[in-house]
Amino acid sequence: MATVQRVVITPGEPAGIGPDLVVQLAQREWPVELVVCADARLLTDRAALLGLPLSLLPYSPNHPAKPQSAGTLTLLPTALRAPVTPGQLSVENGQYVVDTLARACDGCLQGEFAALITGPVHKGVINDAGVPFTGHTEFFEARSQAKKVVMMLATEELRVALATTHLPLRAVADAITPALLHEVIGILHHDLRTKFGLADPHILVCGLNPHAGEGGHMGTEEIDTIVPVLDDLRAQGMRLSGPLPADTLFQPKYLDHADAVLAMYHDQGLPVLKYQGFGRGVNITLGLPFIRTSVDHGTALELAGRGQADVGSFITALNLAIKMIVNTQ
């Protein structure tokens, strides 16, 4: 990395394992400056509970970024709304979580940070606080005024993007339109090139129906919608294979020659990836005007403050963000 960059981290739900994981991140050196948008006492109390050293450094945006030393974090202070007990949700802190996300997102939009890495949030408690919240992806899409974003999960061996995300299964078929597929595949192809450094990415596209429709005998969405879109995009120079049956696509015969898979819906592609690499996966939001990665797990309230949380996914998310920064420079 030619110049040291700043990345911003949001720990997520304060009563969950997010603060534990951020404190664990601080136990090693990093080639970027780690700016954590959080309450200072939350971090120091959690570090004390875990028996880990932590010094919080003041955030100085007007000074050059420095690599993060082990045992330290740079603090961008955001005040809690109520005291925190690990493992116990507080509706009062639902707004605090959103405050951290908003500040981090705005900093990325203004060029203050090169990437954003998010810890796990509890959607229920945010909504109970009176803040409509579907998830990180939708929040950043709206706040950045992005035209469209795409959710992708990745491990070292596999990348799976989704044409639709958090929809009831009965609504998926109606959502798979030519316009949607053109947009999603365009974003996926663009970001694989610009953020992942792949000059000519090869994308495998799942069918919607069992056996990819079996020639129209198990549904016609492949014939009516997916195939025409893929033909059009291939004519524009994209390397696309499909539509392929999802039950046979996830094998070396196909994956060894591909850079990403596009699944039509959430539970078509993600169970395979999470079985293959749970705890090592990263959630990436494509289509944003900045780099955003996240852990692939939840708040694990029962583990908060106990020293049992696995920091692996957070480390992977941060390392991937650093690689993406390099690819975009």
From Swiss-Prot:
InterPro entries named in the record: PdxA (IPR037510), PdxA_fam (IPR005255)
Record-level GO BP terms: pyridoxal phosphate biosynthetic process; pyridoxine biosynthetic process
Compartment(s): Cytoplasm
Chief location bin: cytoplasm
Pathway(s) this gene product operates in, as recorded in its UniProt entry: Cofactor biosynthesis; pyridoxine 5'-phosphate biosynthesis; pyridoxine 5'-phosphate from D-erythrose 4-phosphate: step 4/5
Further comment found in the protein's record: The active site is located at the dimer interface.
Protein name: 4-hydroxythreonine-4-phosphate dehydrogenase
Species: Citrobacter koseri (strain ATCC BAA-895 / CDC 4225-83 / SGSC4696)
